Design a protein with these regions (language model features):
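Short alpha-helix immediately C-terminal to the canonical SAM-binding loop
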Residues: 106-108, 177, 181
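SAM/dcSAM-binding transferase cores
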Residues: 182-237
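Helix-to-beta-strand junctions that scaffold the AdoMet/dcAdoMet cofactor pocket
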Residues: 92, 163-165
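Short "lid" loop at the C-terminus of a central beta-strand within the Rossmann-like core
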Residues: 129, 174-178, 202
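Conserved SAM/SAH cofactor-binding pocket of Class I
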Residues: 60-150, 156-157
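Conserved beta-strand signature within the Rossmann-like core of class I S-adenosyl-L-methionine
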Residues: 166-176
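Short loop/edge segments at beta-strand edges and connector loops
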Residues: 20, 46, 125-127, 197-199
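Class I SAM-dependent transferase core
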Residues: 2-75, 105, 111-120, 227
Length: 237
């Protein structure tokens, strides 16, 4: 289904080498995504070349800015169809990835992909604000990822509680405004985070992306994350 040369080229542009085994995993993923998307909505992007660039290459761009040690623990918050968590795992099967989502059908899709490609992953059917207070998951991860449309202060409150001190929150968006980043500064202070790097790049021509890396420098106070309604209605800051 996928164009092998296009995946190799776009991955190489992100500093990632895709071997034949990895290509097979991505091809299976794309096929399952295409077929499952006919039954319920996982993505608006279904053309193979667009999927390669706008989903796979976009997620692989994380490797340009983050050095994942072997066996690093990562939680993908609001994973949906597996972006970016499943893409990262397909490229780096040594990672220990937990897929968090509140929608069972999406997690069932993730499980089907993992089964087909022969990789292990951890499925967590929960709301982020509930799992973030659970001792099994709170401050247990080296990395948290989110590729979402929520505002940065909201994403920080959902994601930072999962990260252990010294770990990082990787926030991916098509664009953060400088105002949005400034508005998150209070949330970072409260939650124990600090901006480590702000990376803006062109995925392809006229498609600008931004990856913000937030370092966890202190423990998150036990009162956070708050209930979802409070997070949305009154973002920190």
């Amino acid at each position: 289904m996928l164009n092998r040369d296009l995946l190799y080229k776009t991955a190489e542009n992100m500093g990632v080498k895709i071997d034949d085994d990895a290509f097979k995993r991505f091809d299976i993923y794309a096929e399952l995504l295409f077929e499952t998307n006919k039954k319920f909505n996982l993505t608006a992007i279904t053309e193979p070349d667009d999927m390669t660039v706008k989903h796979f290459a976009d997620c692989l761009s994380v490797f340009k800015y983050v050095d994942f040690k072997e066996g690093a623990r990562l939680i993908d918050v609001g994973t949906g169809a597996g972006f970016p968590g499943l893409v990262l795992l397909l490229a780096r099967p040594d990672l220990d990835v937990t897929f968090l989502d509140g929608t069972g059908k999406k997690l069932a899709f993730i499980e089907s992909v993992l089964s087909k490609v022969g990789l292990n992953g951890n499925i967590l059917h929960s709301r982020a604000e509930e799992a973030g207070k659970d001792p099994l998951y709170r401050e247990k991860f080296d990395f948290a990822t989110a590729r979402a449309v929520a505002s940065l202060p909201v994403l920080c409150e959902y994601c930072i509680p999962f990260i252990k001190k010294g770990g990082s929150f990787i926030s991916m968006k098509s664009a953060f405004s400088d105002d949005e980043i400034f508005s998150a500064s209070a949330a970072l202070r409260i939650l124990g985070g600090k901006t480590e790097s702000d990376n803006v790049f062109d995925l392809v021509e006229n498609t600008r992306r931004r990856i913000l890396i937030i370092k966890k420098i202190s423990q998150t106070p036990s009162k956070y994350p708050r209930a979802s309604a409070k997070i949305s209605k009154n973002p920190l800051g």
